[in-house]
Amino acid sequence: GPMGPSGPRGIPGPPGAPGPQGFASGPMGPRGPPGPPGKNGDDGEAGKPGRPGERGPPGPQGARGIPGTAGIPGMKGHRGFSGIDGAKGDAGPAGPKGEPGSPGENGAPGQMGPRGIPGERGRPGAPGPAGARGNDGATGAAGPPGPTGPAGPPGFPGAVGAKGEAGPQGARGSEGPQGVRGEPGPPGPAGAAGPAGNPGADGQPGAKGANGAPGIAGAPGFPGARGPSGPQGPSGPPGPKGNSGEPGAPGSKGDTGAKGEPGPTGIQGPPGPAGEEGKRGARGEPGPTGIPGPPGERGGPGARGFPGSDGVAGPKGPAGERGAPGPAGPKGSPGEAGRPGEAGIPGAKGITGSPGSPGPDGKTGPPGPAGQDGRPGPPGPPGARGQAGVMGFPGPKGAAGEPGKAGERGVPGPPGAVGPAGKDGEAGAQGPPGPAGPAGERGEQGPAGSPGIGAPGPSGARGERGFPGERGVQGPPGPAGPRGANGAPGNDGAKGIQGMPGERGAAGIPGPKGDRGDAGPKGADGSPGKDGVRGITGPIGPPGPAGAPGDKGESGPSGPAGPTGARGAPGDRGEPGPPGPAGFAGPPGADGQPGAKGEPGDAGAKGDAGPPGPAGPTGPPGPIGNVGAPGPKGARGSAGPPGATGFPGAAGRVGPPGPSGNAGPPGPPGPVGKEGGKGPRGETGPAGRPGEAGPPGPPGPAGEKGSPGADGPAGAPGTPGPQGIAGQRGVVGIPGQRGERGFPGIPGPSGEPGKQGPSGASGERGPPGPVGPPGIAGPPGESGREGAPGAEGSPGRDGSPGPKGDRGETGPAGPPGAPGAPGAPGPVGPAGKSGDRGETGPAGPAGPIGPVGARGPAGPQGPRGDKGETGEQGDRGIKGHRGFSGIQGPPGPPGSPGEQGPSGASGPAGPRGPPGSAGAPGKDGINGIPGPIGPPGPRGRTGDAGPVGPPGPPGPPGPPGPP
């Protein structure tokens, strides 16, 4: 006999273990001094649109509409005399069109069928593109300022590690769970059907193919390029004011300085406190008229003094000691999201794994709730061709009726009942932070006051010391002063408050890849999972090649009569036979039976794609966002209404400024103010003089870590302690077993995009502080005692993979989601394999012809059917006698279209014939397109603590002491 079919494909061997990975780069050098703050980066690119939601299952088919009333049949024509064929009668007029039936109600959804036998595992698709790089983390709060250390020399780049040798062949892992069956691709073009071949002899079964050789281990992919760093986040809100410095010792009287040029008119200050009743002083010379200040509280009547002589201005006193640094300000808002990093180089294609063992049949799940009417699904696959019935006796040829017109499309049925509300799913992983809004513009500066009138008068005598005024706004920090000499070692200071945790160190160098672990024992079989939701019906595959015809089966008993079929198209007119002998003209005969059903015509071409469906309903609003961080302290309220204007008194001489008072305790935090509207942009004020830097304080010892207490009320901000000593690295934990991959959840509805909040108002710039002398460096403190154990250390390197866990149960099917927007057409899938050709059964006897029912509404166009099989050639009939030519009769009136009788009952199925010869194996399908980029993965573990960074720049100087 001929050669048997090819054996099944061998199981691919297990993949080889990848070699160890070399270092991507050398060790990181010491951290350099912090650079100047960068400008805000441009807005990040808009996120990619989410993939469209899954298509809902098609709704149940509505009940068939009530058929319309049949049209009035045409007039019955007289039968012509038999003779030569008369002229063909015209078709009768069509009956009135029936009204469309009312749409039927949706049927209840049927129960889920038993789970089918799993098919062969498909080839793995090409690896998808690398996931987008996650957003950069938020900028941490700045640590306490310290002296600037010298920048260390840059480290040498480490040598690239040599490529490791390939590891030994790993043991075969336990078989994985059954993969989710992929959706079939769209149908390919139908090939032309070949002629039917002669039935071949039964082939011998082919020998089983040898197992395929194990695949070669793929080379490790190159590490993806590091994405650009995100822009620097905006600076945090300013910290609270520091305590004022102690007043300095009064300086000795200096020489009179030269008279300075009059300065620009300052901004009107807030009203001062009420003054005490002044003593009677010497009468002063009338000075120039100054700018009227804000009305203060009215003081008691002072005695009129005599004018005194001009006093000599004293020398400038030394700067007071530096005040304690203020507490650290709240953590700044996270910076804008960085641009997505460049996609990494796609890794090498992995080795095809061995197919998993088929899982146990799942139990039938409970019927799901009735879903909403889905969009019309793709056309289903063509049904299996029925067995041919026994050819009936040919009936007399009827008059050809006019082909009917297609009925109009029925009215769409009402939407189905809304299913019950779905339960809230588990909260998904936190999404990446959205892009930060643009920074608000700075408000416009108010107009400057009008300049004073009059010439400057001589300096007056030194007045008595006034009440301390309110503390002015702290000026900008000045440049760092020269470092003073080291002082004598001081006594041990008191234990300081525990410092705030330092900034997170830079990420460490990734360690070498760990060795592949030994395969664990195979887990126990999982319990049968619940039946999953039925997938969307795939498109029709291309028709397979025609198989060899099978042996003719034996005739079986007649089957029951089938339902009345739809009216078929009129058959082709038969070839005229030879004329018979002329007979005598007989009486008009009865109406003939309708002709036999003609061969079905070729199916029409596939129609154009319909218009896209309507857009789905708008999703529910997204969840309420987290409460934002408290805003900065509100601006100072405006002054109260001015009192009644008194009579202008004589302008007094300007007294020396009093010393700064001690700062009072901070008041309780006020209520959160409402966000005001965006103010006009202010003009940039003049830059103040930079103050000199004071000496840095000695670092205190690290405090012990206390147990967390209950949240108390917000207290007054305290002074920050020195930076604590970094804790020891924690013990590396044992890596847990890797869980199996869960089934993908239904994508939730998209939330509404957040709106940008209004920009806060810009504060006024304070006056510049005076330049103080360089301070004396304090003595270095002693090393503190060892601190408490630090926070949990960063995770160690990746451990060996544990054994594969048992397969989890399939979760219950969720309610169908709302239909999404129409998706883009998918790619062309691989061509399916040819199916076996069905057997041709014997034809059953022809049943009686029944009445024709009323024509129902036209259904939707079905898929193109397979080309029918060529029937067996019938025996040639006996040549009849040549008849006499008859007299041509007059043409009869148009006859009414004959009604088609019901189809005969299908004959019984014959015995299964021997299998045909195996067809040629189909070509391997092309790899599927890469899937969409998955959602961002969970946040990675915290890296090891980096080296302690250099101390920050010195803080701003304290307020000046009294002269």
Swiss-Prot record:
Residues 40-54, 864-878 have a biased composition (Basic and acidic residues). The modification Phosphoserine is found at S82, S558. Forms the fibrils of tendon, ligaments and bones. In bones, the fibrils are mineralized with calcium hydroxyapatite. It is found in: Secreted; Secreted, Extracellular space; Secreted, Extracellular space, Extracellular matrix. Keywords: Calcium, Collagen, Extracellular matrix, Hydroxylation, Phosphoprotein, Repeat, Secreted. GO terms for cellular component: collagen trimer; extracellular matrix; extracellular space. Its main location: secreted. The keyword Calcium applies. Residues 1-963 are annotated as: Disordered. Residues 144-156, 611-623, 767-777, 813-828, 948-963 have a biased composition (Pro residues). The keyword Calcium applies. This is Collagen alpha-1(I) chain. It comes from Tapirus terrestris. The gene is COL1A1.
